[in-house]
């Protein structure tokens, strides 16, 4: 008789684990505490703009193979769209200067040898000085590893590392930053084409996974919050949802794919990150100008990245805790001013919405990175998943999928023994 796998949490980590286990033919049961699957990667209808918007502008790169394989498995890889080449346009709104970093289409970072493809006013030596980050340890600081000043840092390195680490780059883990650089910039343009979910995060990465699982007979229960894990002889024996208790057989497996605070509550003594950082996203109902760049890096203002979608302009601001206590009406006017300057547009403030993910990611410092647990727990049949676990990457969608796949592999190994 086939074993069962119970997955707690229907975010990207939980869904990726569920899809992989379903592909292997195992009965899968998914339980989600909220009313919507997707976790921090979801879409919703917003009445203020009268549009369906994402909670965040999650950017995928063509080299994120785990995300792309996951999308392929649920039949939506074509929904991840972007330019055919790895070209990143930027604007400095403090100087009105515009440029484009052209990473080419190969597997090597040969673009650094071509002046026209580099950041303006930078030399080859500036890029070579970044090399130490490639072999830096996770306990080292970015600020002690590479120069955190100068033109290259301000115009390229800082925007990329700020988006990846979601903390002030000099304070971030050089090891985590190095992992990002190795898998993107060092891998050449072939790995760096930016991709976004064309029809929204839920439509591309969440709902198709749920439908696939349900077609295969899996159960996906929403509004089903786990209250307690019961143990017997160092294995999980029962899932306590309050009014509903589910027995876990001796040959079953459980994957805990919930946020770190919930995991620590369910597993007393579990070490998890304790410091988090916010990401602020703003959405405007506004038709982008014809020929607008789908993704534009912005330097010299509050806005960091500007995304152009049909009927909508959207921005992302990382490490956004400094904005949380400022009235939204004040913040949105500063953001809209930056959008107009960066996008070359004008007009009164259109219908808008601001989405603040207060605990968007763990703080990617060496100290917090050291608190990330691996997937194995003290219970033989219980495994952890989540972008906050020890994936070797900062908190990203790629890390989420990797952690889910890793937990699924361990569950498969356990149920096959």
From Swiss-Prot:
Keywords assigned: FAD, Flavoprotein, Oxidoreductase, Plasmid
Pathway(s) annotated for this protein in UniProt: Secondary metabolite biosynthesis; hopanoid biosynthesis
SUPFAM superfamilies: FAD/NAD(P)-binding domain
Catalytic activity entry: squalene + FAD + H2O + H(+) = hydroxysqualene + FADH2
GO MF, any single term: oxidoreductase activity
Keyword Flavoprotein on entry: yes
Signal sequence extent: none
InterPro entries named in the record: Amino_oxidase, FAD/NAD-bd_sf, SQase_HpnE, Zeta_carotene_desat/Oxidored
EC numbers for this chain: 1.17.8.1
A Pfam family assignment: Amino_oxidase
NCBIfam families to which the protein is assigned, alphabetical: HpnE
Primary role: Involved in the biosynthesis of the hopanoid precursor squalene (SQ) from farnesyl diphosphate (FPP). Catalyzes the third (last) step, the reduction of hydroxysqualene (HSQ) to SQ.
Family to which the UniProt record says this protein belongs: Belongs to the HpnE family.
Protein known as: Hydroxysqualene dehydroxylase
């Amino acid at each position: 008789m086939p074993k069962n796998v119970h997955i707690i949490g229907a975010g990207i980590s939980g869904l990726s684990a569920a899809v992989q286990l379903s592909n292997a033919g195992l009965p899968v049961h998914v339980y989600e505490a909220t009313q919507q699957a997707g976790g921090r990667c979801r879409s919703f209808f917003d009445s203020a703009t009268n549009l369906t918007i994402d909670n965040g502008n999650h950017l995928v790169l063509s080299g994120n193979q785990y995300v792309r394989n996951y999308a392929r498995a649920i039949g939506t890889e074509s929904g991840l769209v972007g330019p055919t080449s790895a070209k990143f346009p930027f604007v400095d709104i403090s100087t009105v200067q515009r440029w484009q970093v052209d990473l080419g289409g190969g597997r090597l970072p040969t673009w650094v040898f071509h002046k026209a493809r580099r950041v303006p006013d930078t030399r080859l030596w500036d890029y070579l000085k970044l090399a130490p980050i490639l072999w830096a340890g996770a306990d080292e600081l970015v600020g002690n590893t590479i120069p955190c000043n100068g033109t290259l840092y301000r115009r390229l390195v800082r925007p990329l590392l700020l988006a990846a680490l979601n903390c002030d780059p000099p304070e971030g883990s050089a090891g985590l930053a190095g992992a990002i650089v190795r898998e993107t910039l060092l891998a050449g343009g072939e790995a760096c084409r930016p991709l976004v979910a064309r029809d929204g995060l839920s439509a591309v990465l969440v709902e198709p996974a749920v439908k696939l699982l349900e077609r295969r007979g899996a159960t996906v229960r929403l509004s089903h919050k786990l209250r307690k894990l019961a143990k017997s002889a160092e294995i999980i024996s029962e899932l306590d949802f309050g009014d509903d208790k589910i027995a876990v057989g001796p040959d079953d497996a459980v994957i805990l794919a919930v946020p770190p605070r919930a995991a620590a509550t369910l597993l007393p003594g579990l070490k998890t990150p304790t410091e988090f950082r916010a990401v602020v996203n703003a959405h405007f109902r506004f038709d982008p100008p014809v020929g607008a760049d789908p993704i534009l890096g912005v330097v010299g203002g509050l806005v960091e990245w500007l995304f152009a979608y049909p009927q909508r302009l959207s921005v992302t601001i990382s490490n956004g805790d400094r904005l949380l206590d400022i009235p939204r009406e004040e913040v949105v006017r500063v953001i809209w001013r930056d959008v107009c300057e960066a996008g070359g547009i004008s007009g009164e403030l259109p219908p808008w919405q601001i989405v603040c993910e207060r605990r968007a990611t763990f703080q990617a410092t060496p100290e917090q990175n050291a608190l990330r647990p691996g997937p194995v727990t003290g219970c033989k049949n219980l495994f952890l998943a989540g972008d906050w676990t020890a994936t070797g990457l900062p908190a990203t969608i790629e890390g989420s999928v990797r952690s889910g796949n890793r937990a699924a592999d361990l569950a498969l190994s356990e149920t096959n023994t």
